[in-house]
Protein backbone atom coordinates (compact mmCIF):
# COMPACT_ATOMS: atom_id res chain seq x y z
CA UNK A 1 0.00 0.00 0.00
CA UNK A 2 2.76 2.43 0.92
CA UNK A 3 4.96 1.57 -2.08
CA UNK A 4 2.08 1.91 -4.54
CA UNK A 5 0.84 5.12 -2.95
CA UNK A 6 -2.66 3.75 -2.33
CA UNK A 7 -4.62 5.86 0.19
CA UNK A 8 -5.93 4.46 3.47
CA UNK A 9 -9.17 2.42 3.13
CA UNK A 10 -8.97 2.50 -0.67
CA UNK A 11 -11.11 -0.31 -2.21
CA UNK A 12 -8.28 -1.15 -4.63
CA UNK A 13 -6.41 -2.63 -1.69
CA UNK A 14 -7.90 -6.08 -0.94
CA UNK A 15 -6.64 -5.88 2.62
CA UNK A 16 -9.12 -3.07 3.30
CA UNK A 17 -12.00 -5.56 3.42
CA UNK A 18 -10.26 -7.66 6.05
CA UNK A 19 -9.34 -4.51 7.95
CA UNK A 20 -12.96 -3.30 8.02
CA UNK A 21 -14.17 -6.72 9.13
CA UNK A 22 -11.66 -6.66 11.96
CA UNK A 23 -12.73 -3.15 12.94
CA UNK A 24 -16.36 -4.22 13.17
CA UNK A 25 -15.66 -7.41 15.09
CA UNK A 26 -13.15 -5.93 17.51
CA UNK A 27 -14.11 -2.29 17.86
CA UNK A 28 -17.90 -2.50 17.51
CA UNK A 29 -19.15 -5.97 18.41
CA UNK A 30 -16.34 -6.76 20.85
CA UNK A 31 -16.44 -3.44 22.64
CA UNK A 32 -20.24 -3.49 22.78
CA UNK A 33 -20.23 -6.98 24.27
CA UNK A 34 -17.61 -5.97 26.82
CA UNK A 35 -19.60 -2.91 27.90
CA UNK A 36 -22.79 -4.96 28.11
CA UNK A 37 -21.05 -7.58 30.23
CA UNK A 38 -19.75 -4.92 32.63
CA UNK A 39 -23.18 -3.27 32.79
CA UNK A 40 -25.05 -6.49 33.55
CA UNK A 41 -22.33 -7.61 35.95
CA UNK A 42 -22.65 -4.42 37.99
CA UNK A 43 -26.44 -4.79 38.16
CA UNK A 44 -26.25 -8.42 39.29
CA UNK A 45 -23.53 -7.60 41.83
CA UNK A 46 -25.68 -4.85 43.36
CA UNK A 47 -28.67 -7.21 43.52
CA UNK A 48 -26.62 -9.93 45.23
CA UNK A 49 -25.26 -7.46 47.79
CA UNK A 50 -28.78 -6.22 48.53
CA UNK A 51 -30.09 -9.78 48.84
CA UNK A 52 -27.34 -10.76 51.30
CA UNK A 53 -27.80 -7.66 53.46
CA UNK A 54 -30.20 -7.93 56.38
CA UNK A 55 -30.80 -4.16 56.29
CA UNK A 56 -32.10 -4.17 52.71
CA UNK A 57 -35.41 -5.51 51.47
CA UNK A 58 -36.82 -6.51 48.11
CA UNK A 59 -36.99 -2.90 46.93
CA UNK A 60 -33.21 -2.61 47.07
CA UNK A 61 -32.93 -5.76 44.96
CA UNK A 62 -35.26 -4.31 42.33
CA UNK A 63 -33.62 -0.88 42.30
CA UNK A 64 -30.63 -1.75 40.03
CA UNK A 65 -32.98 -3.19 37.40
CA UNK A 66 -35.26 -0.17 37.56
CA UNK A 67 -32.38 2.29 37.30
CA UNK A 68 -30.93 0.25 34.43
CA UNK A 69 -34.25 0.52 32.58
CA UNK A 70 -34.36 4.28 33.17
CA UNK A 71 -30.78 4.51 31.93
CA UNK A 72 -31.65 2.59 28.76
CA UNK A 73 -34.51 4.95 27.93
CA UNK A 74 -32.40 8.03 28.73
CA UNK A 75 -29.54 6.72 26.55
CA UNK A 76 -31.87 6.10 23.59
CA UNK A 77 -33.22 9.65 23.87
CA UNK A 78 -29.66 10.95 24.14
CA UNK A 79 -28.62 9.10 20.99
CA UNK A 80 -31.58 10.42 19.00
CA UNK A 81 -30.84 13.95 20.21
CA UNK A 82 -27.79 13.77 17.96
CA UNK A 83 -30.11 14.33 14.99
CA UNK A 84 -30.79 17.80 16.41
CA UNK A 85 -27.29 18.56 17.67
CA UNK A 86 -25.39 17.32 14.59
CA UNK A 87 -26.14 20.51 12.66
CA UNK A 88 -23.63 22.43 14.77
CA UNK A 89 -20.05 23.10 13.74
CA UNK A 90 -18.41 21.24 16.64
CA UNK A 91 -18.99 17.49 16.30
CA UNK A 92 -17.13 16.73 19.54
CA UNK A 93 -19.36 19.14 21.47
CA UNK A 94 -22.46 17.51 19.96
CA UNK A 95 -21.33 14.06 21.09
CA UNK A 96 -20.51 15.48 24.51
CA UNK A 97 -23.94 17.07 24.81
CA UNK A 98 -25.72 13.80 24.04
CA UNK A 99 -24.01 12.35 27.10
CA UNK A 100 -25.15 15.28 29.23
CA UNK A 101 -28.73 14.99 27.97
CA UNK A 102 -28.86 11.26 28.72
CA UNK A 103 -27.32 11.81 32.17
CA UNK A 104 -29.79 14.56 33.10
CA UNK A 105 -32.74 12.44 32.00
CA UNK A 106 -31.37 9.50 33.98
CA UNK A 107 -30.97 11.59 37.13
CA UNK A 108 -34.45 13.07 36.75
CA UNK A 109 -36.04 9.68 36.15
CA UNK A 110 -34.17 8.12 39.05
CA UNK A 111 -35.17 10.79 41.55
CA UNK A 112 -38.80 10.74 40.41
CA UNK A 113 -38.88 6.96 40.85
CA UNK A 114 -37.38 7.05 44.34
CA UNK A 115 -38.54 10.35 45.76
CA UNK A 116 -41.13 10.26 48.51
CA UNK A 117 -42.65 13.70 48.88
CA UNK A 118 -44.68 15.87 46.57
CA UNK A 119 -45.14 12.99 44.17
CA UNK A 120 -46.21 10.62 46.93
CA UNK A 121 -44.76 7.16 47.43
CA UNK A 122 -41.94 6.35 45.05
CA UNK A 123 -42.07 3.30 42.82
CA UNK A 124 -39.81 1.54 45.29
CA UNK A 125 -39.12 2.34 48.93
CA UNK A 126 -35.38 2.96 49.30
CA UNK A 127 -33.27 5.61 50.98
CA UNK A 128 -32.83 8.62 48.70
CA UNK A 129 -29.14 8.70 49.62
CA UNK A 130 -28.67 5.67 47.37
CA UNK A 131 -29.73 7.78 44.40
CA UNK A 132 -27.25 10.45 45.47
CA UNK A 133 -24.55 7.76 45.22
CA UNK A 134 -25.77 6.76 41.75
CA UNK A 135 -25.67 10.36 40.55
CA UNK A 136 -22.20 10.83 42.02
CA UNK A 137 -20.99 7.73 40.20
CA UNK A 138 -22.34 8.96 36.87
CA UNK A 139 -20.76 12.38 37.44
CA UNK A 140 -17.41 10.71 38.08
CA UNK A 141 -17.82 8.66 34.90
CA UNK A 142 -18.58 11.75 32.82
CA UNK A 143 -15.64 13.61 34.38
CA UNK A 144 -13.29 10.75 33.53
CA UNK A 145 -14.58 10.87 29.96
CA UNK A 146 -13.80 14.59 29.76
CA UNK A 147 -10.30 14.01 31.14
CA UNK A 148 -9.79 11.27 28.55
CA UNK A 149 -10.98 13.62 25.83
CA UNK A 150 -8.50 16.25 27.00
CA UNK A 151 -5.52 13.88 26.91
CA UNK A 152 -6.42 12.10 23.66
CA UNK A 153 -8.12 14.78 21.56
CA UNK A 154 -7.04 17.89 19.70
CA UNK A 155 -10.21 19.98 20.11
CA UNK A 156 -10.67 22.25 23.16
CA UNK A 157 -12.79 20.83 26.00
CA UNK A 158 -15.06 23.59 27.32
CA UNK A 159 -12.61 26.16 26.01
CA UNK A 160 -9.57 24.47 27.57
CA UNK A 161 -7.01 23.81 24.86
CA UNK A 162 -5.39 20.40 25.05
CA UNK A 163 -1.61 20.34 25.24
CA UNK A 164 -1.00 16.58 25.44
CA UNK A 165 -1.30 15.57 21.77
CA UNK A 166 0.49 18.67 20.40
CA UNK A 167 3.28 18.02 22.92
CA UNK A 168 3.70 14.43 21.72
CA UNK A 169 3.65 15.62 18.11
CA UNK A 170 6.30 18.23 18.84
CA UNK A 171 8.51 15.66 20.57
CA UNK A 172 8.15 13.33 17.58
CA UNK A 173 10.08 15.77 15.41
CA UNK A 174 13.35 14.78 17.07
CA UNK A 175 12.89 11.04 16.61
CA UNK A 176 11.08 7.92 17.81
CA UNK A 177 12.83 7.86 21.19
CA UNK A 178 11.45 11.23 22.30
CA UNK A 179 8.08 10.24 20.86
CA UNK A 180 7.97 7.14 23.05
CA UNK A 181 9.14 9.04 26.14
CA UNK A 182 6.59 11.83 25.62
CA UNK A 183 3.77 9.36 24.97
CA UNK A 184 4.64 7.34 28.06
CA UNK A 185 4.85 10.42 30.28
CA UNK A 186 1.55 11.84 29.04
CA UNK A 187 -0.12 8.45 29.42
CA UNK A 188 1.06 8.07 33.00
CA UNK A 189 0.11 11.65 33.86
CA UNK A 190 -3.37 11.18 32.37
CA UNK A 191 -4.25 8.56 35.01
CA UNK A 192 -3.72 10.91 37.97
CA UNK A 193 -7.00 12.83 37.80
CA UNK A 194 -9.16 9.73 37.13
CA UNK A 195 -7.63 8.02 40.18
CA UNK A 196 -8.56 11.01 42.35
CA UNK A 197 -12.06 11.09 40.86
CA UNK A 198 -12.63 7.39 41.50
CA UNK A 199 -11.37 7.72 45.08
CA UNK A 200 -13.65 10.72 45.67
CA UNK A 201 -16.55 8.81 44.13
CA UNK A 202 -15.99 5.83 46.42
CA UNK A 203 -15.87 7.97 49.55
CA UNK A 204 -18.85 10.04 48.43
CA UNK A 205 -20.97 7.02 47.56
CA UNK A 206 -20.18 5.46 50.93
CA UNK A 207 -21.16 8.72 52.63
CA UNK A 208 -24.52 8.99 50.87
CA UNK A 209 -25.49 5.33 50.65
CA UNK A 210 -23.32 3.59 53.24
Annotate the PLM regions.
Residues 1-210:
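Hydrophobic packing and interface segments
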